[in-house]
Swiss-Prot record:
Protein's recorded name: Cytochrome b
Organism: Arctocephalus gazella (Antarctic fur seal)
Lineage summary: Eukaryota, Metazoa, Chordata, Craniata, Vertebrata
Binding site for heme b b562: H83, H182
CDD domains given in the database record: cytochrome_b_C, Cytochrome_b_N
Family the entry assigns: Belongs to the cytochrome b family.
One GO MF term: metal ion binding
Record keywords, A-Z: Electron transport, Heme, Iron, Membrane, Metal-binding, Mitochondrion, Mitochondrion inner membrane, Respiratory chain, Transmembrane, Transmembrane helix, Transport, Ubiquinone
Cysteines engaged in disulfide bonds, as pairs: none
Transmembrane stretches, start-end: 33-53, 77-98, 113-133, 178-198, 226-246, 288-308, 320-340, 347-367
Length: 379
């Protein structure tokens, strides 16, 4: 009798995705981040659900309800800090996952890549709205500044912003709808993840060599299940170290001050994982230009497959492209640092140079490097 896991309609899908899936025999730890992202998403939905049981999305009680969670709810502080720091772990894994895709040329799987970009945008929107919910100073002013960027859209901008706010400023209506969206979007993300995997399993995974691995596949279980479990344990270890020893390390102290529309904090800045984009936004002295640059800083990923000039898929054997890739990583770290600095000399100049370099590497230098490497190899 055939095994039930291969016969049952539901078990069959799980079996073909996680058990009997033919996987390349040489995928490295950089391929762990997909499953780590799934772990992060599950953790965020679970901790978020328990937080939502105690949270109230009203301007008068939101801040107090978060305080109540931390002080009075059994292990509420653990749940709250796991959720807040879980978001940081989520974005670390996200950026590593995208970086892996860039380095090894996984963007040649265009459908998977494009769904990934949509996922990235959705997760960024979810995280932004989540940051508004505790209703501290940085929550309120972050929401005000970021939503206000939409007013740069010609003609409809102002109406659009007021429509999103549900009034003439960030207020009760804004907080309530942000909570509603913050609750629903992770489930949208889950659905998109399924589509992401559907497209991935149409082609199979890429691998570090960039060469087809059809002739050398191994079953996903037990080889990669055990590898993924090890990765997940390391992820949870790092997360719990953060939660237990320095839960506020990555947060902003201003968010422990209740939101006050009458007093602006000295430095309005988003969470650390948005600082690189915030730095690009601020480096352009024109409002609409800044907003476009902010959008393009992520949307540029969509045209990466079109800019691939090399005859090799990954960068494993392409030293010039490797140098540019790590320069890009360093540049993004510099932008992240700049995003958290005040708008004054020399930070403005450094931010502008780093922003120019970011777009130059992706749009100009990497395609040129691909052509040079082809010529060196006489291809």
């Amino acid at each position: 009798m055939t095994n039930i896991r291969k016969m049952h309609p539901l078990a069959k899908i799980i079996n073909n995705s996680l058990i009997d899936l033919p996987a390349p025999s040489n995928i490295s730890a950089w391929w762990n981040f997909g499953s780590l992202l799934a772990v992060c998403l599950a953790l965020q939905i679970l901790t978020g659900l328990f937080l939502a049981m105690h949270y109230t999305s009203d301007t008068t009680t939101a801040f107090s309800s978060v305080t109540h969670i931390c002080r009075d709810v059994n292990y509420g502080w653990v749940i709250r800090y796991m959720h807040a720091n879980g978001a940081s772990m989520f974005f670390i894994c996200l950026y590593m996952h995208v970086g892996r895709g860039l380095y090894y040329g996984s963007y040649t799987l265009t459908e998977t890549w494009n769904i990934g970009i949509i996922l990235l945008f959705t997760i960024m929107a979810t995280a932004f709205m989540g940051y508004v919910l505790p209703w501290g100073q940085m929550s309120f002013w972050g929401a005000t500044v970021i939503t206000n960027l939409l007013s740069a859209i010609p003609y409809i901008g102002t109406n659009l912003v007021e429509w999103i706010w549900g009034g003439f400023s960030v207020d009760k209506a804004t907080l309530t709808r942000f909570f509603a969206f913050h609750f629903i979007l992770p489930f949208v993300v889950s659905a998109l993840v399924m589509v992401h995997l559907l497209f991935l399993h149409e082609t199979g995974s890429n691998n570090p060599s960039g060469v087809s691995s059809d002739s050398d596949k191994i079953p996903f279980h037990p080889y990669y299940t055990i590898k993924d479990i090890l990765g997940a344990l390391l992820l949870i270890l790092i997360l719990m170290l953060l939660v237990m020893f320095s839960p506020d390390l990555l947060g902003d102290p201003d968010n422990y001050i209740p939101a006050n529309p009458l007093s602006t904090p000295p430095h309005i800045k988003p969470e650390w994982y948005f600082l690189f984009a915030y730095a690009i936004l601020r480096s352009i002295p024109n409002k609409l230009g800044g907003v476009l640059a902010l959008l393009l800083s992520i949307l540029i990923l969509a045209i990466i497959p079109l800019l691939h000039t090399s005859k090799q898929r990954g960068m494993m054997f392409r030293p010039i492209s490797q140098f540019l890739f790590w320069l890009l990583v360093a540049d993004l770290l510099a932008l992240t640092w700049i995003g958290g600095q005040p708008v004054e000399y020399p930070f403005i100049t450094i931010g502008q140079l780093a922003s120019i370099l970011y777009f130059a590497i992706l749009l100009i230098l990497m395609p040129i490097a691909g052509i040079i490497e082809n010529n060196i190899l006489k291809w």
